[in-house]
Amino acid sequence: MNFFCISAYNNDLDWLEEYPNSHIIYDKCCFGGWADNDNSELLPPSNLKEKYPKYNITNGDPNGYNISDYMTFIIDNYDDLPDVTCFLKGNTISRHIRKEIFDHIINNKCFTPIEDWRAH
């Protein structure tokens, strides 16, 4: 099974229960954050480590985009990277792709864009 590197910002991660894949989750909202782009609503800390004690969760960079978490993973694990890594946002299934498409492609062994053209 492919390894999941997940960048989460105030996301519900219940969907991960269905996938036995090894993973790491970078919690971008571990210290709190903003609910929207205009910084009008402050979010409390996500407490993902308490919500999901079985998950492998670490603090993400609250100032960077999801790509900063992916690069952190690559740099920190450069000498021992998994054979295949899926770089995901915490809301991938609910926002970017339908679950049935995700299930069909998620353990591919070659580059596969995670997109669902019919979902938009």
What are these regions (language model features)?
Residues 1-120:
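ER/Golgi luminal nucleotide-sugar-dependent glycosyltransferases, focusing on the catalytic module
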